[in-house]
Amino acid sequence: EEEALAELKNRNFELIICMPNMDNRDIFAAATEIKIHYPNIPIVVLTPFSKEVSKRIANEDLSAIDYVFSWLGNAELLLAIIKLIEDKMNAPDDTASVGVQIILLVEDSVRFYSSALPHLYKFVLEQSQMFAKEALNDHQRTLRMRGRPKIKLARTYEEAVRIFNQYRDN
């Protein structure tokens, strides 16, 4: 924990990915401490899928964790995590200024959304690239790539309703 805080003090990070293991290190307490000092840095827990880890995570305080993902061996999950966080940060401005659409994925199963999000992002990015090729110049191409639908993940019904109401006019 002290080592991570020292690194954060000396360097600029835009994302923290923690991987829990079954030793005595408490990444959840460390995440809470990091969030106190660096509240704007997203913290993601990337965990192997197992019953033991799932039970442990179910009993942890996840208030400092932005997302929990299950590592299923698909490297595209890392891109999906980055894009999901970018979408979370950019959606309010992009929907208000450019009218970007929102895709709302509602799912409470970590294992399922860890599997589905990489496929969803791959599809959306491929569609955006095809759409951008139709642009007349570089500026239009850039605007069309930025204008791809943003994906929002809701893990509870209440979160889904809140996101829906926030972006209902898009």
Q: In which residue ranges do the predicted regions lie?
A:
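Conserved phosphotransfer microenvironments
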Residues: 1-5, 13-40, 47-58, 65, ...
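Alpha-helix termini
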Residues: 88-94, 124-143, 167-168
